[in-house]
Amino acid sequence: GSEMCIRDRYGDNGIVAFCFYIATLFRDIITDSTRSFPILNIYGKKGTGKTEFALFLMALFQNNPEVSNLESTTYYAMGEKCAEVSNMLVHFDEYKNSLSNKHIDFLKGVYDNAGRSKRSSDGEHREATKINCGVLITGQEMPTADIALFSRVIFLESQKSERSKEETDKYQKFLKLRNMCPTNITVGLMRYRENFNAGWYD
């Protein structure tokens, strides 16, 4: 299955990421009681496969997913992107500690389900857009610009390693599965929504 494939490729990191994916599917149920939900951060230097890792997780939700570069994505666009979906992953690439305070504050707010602040339709007051998606960030820098942000992420480090013939074969199998756009896995898991809801509150 897909969980075996991702475990073969990424080991314990793959297991953690797959658990995050499942939690994202039922994020609304989880946050009804926890009021918070962490960000998944895949960190790694260039060539370590972090983007391939992230794209596999995104492929579980949609074909040819859009990846937003944080440096060229405004604070407002981040909010709109997160508000568009529910119980689904949103991917922001190229995290850097030099990002603006607004970008960093937005990411911190994701943990508490708070999006960007905007003026209400009547113009009388400001309101925060609610976030109900899982957020995945990737980059070559650890998110240490603000310790409060670092405490809100599940931190996974993607490391480059020399591949044996067997590992290369597993990698090709991994890419093949990703390119098939395995959204059927997500559809299959949604059948267990009622079971998850009941079990979560047991």
Language model features by range: what are they?
Residues 6-12:
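A short glycine/serine-rich beta->alpha loop
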Residues 15, 24-201:
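Conserved NTP-binding/hydrolysis core of motor NTPases
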Residues 1-5:
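Short, small-residue-biased leader/transition segments that mark boundaries at the very start
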